[in-house]
Amino acid sequence: METLNLPAGYRLERGLLWPADDRDCAALVFDTVPDMDHALKHCRQFELAVQAGGNMGVWALSLAAKFDRVVTFEPDPKNFRALVHNTSTAKNILSLPCALGNEAGTWCDLEREAGNAGAHQVTMGDIAPIVTLDGLNLPALDLLYLDIEGFEMMAILGALETIVRFKPVIAIEDKGLSDRYGYSQGQAEKFLATHGYEVVARPHRDVVMVCR
């Protein structure tokens, strides 16, 4: 049998390239893909979805089966290499090595939790650029799906013009990690409520909101 030559520091996880040192992330990622259905059933159109963090591409690949186009963001260089490899045959996925935030033009470092390729804390540095969704001038936005370890509020602030314009379905992870950045748990939800959004589902630690 032919042996697949993997890049150093990677393994295969359910057929996808994956960081070899990850212990905790893989099972959680695959187990939570069905949670997307709570958001998808509220989408009226399926032209464009934005998803962050991209991780190794599992969520982006799932969304690519539904949407015409998917834009995914992953600032961790090791994860991004796997993401690009795993999504290379999906021509409707655009992968960007950036963090979504509210201050375009700044750069960040990523403090990675040992054994968990999906757990990061953003600090100022020089590993990856921070961009705003508003700065991309997207032609549409039907779903905004954010799982970025407490950085969701900053991403929303940097996407507010786009959100107001297109009124996408929004799904965010909210497990209290926003405290790291000066925002309390539930603050992003309350902020979106002031712009006409209401909660329609709470799968696990996520909050799904739609604009009425």
Task: Locate the predicted segments by residue.
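S-adenosyl-L-methionine
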Residues: M1-T89, L177, Q185-F191, V199-R212
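Glycine-rich adenosyl-binding loop in Rossmann-like folds that engage adenosine-containing cofactors
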Residues: A8, L12-D37, K91-P139
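Short internal loop-to-helix segment that lines adenine-nucleotide cofactor pockets
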Residues: A27-V50, N116-F166, S178-G182
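Hydrophobic pocket-lining residues within nucleotide cofactor-binding pockets
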Residues: G54, C98-N102, I148, D174
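Hydrophobic packing residues within well-ordered alpha-helices of enzyme cores
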Residues: L63, L83, D109-L110, A155-A159
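Short, hinge-like loop/turn segments at secondary-structure boundaries
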Residues: S88-A90, L110-N116, T162-I163, Q187-F191
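Proline-aspartate-enriched helix->loop->beta-strand connector
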Residues: P168-I172
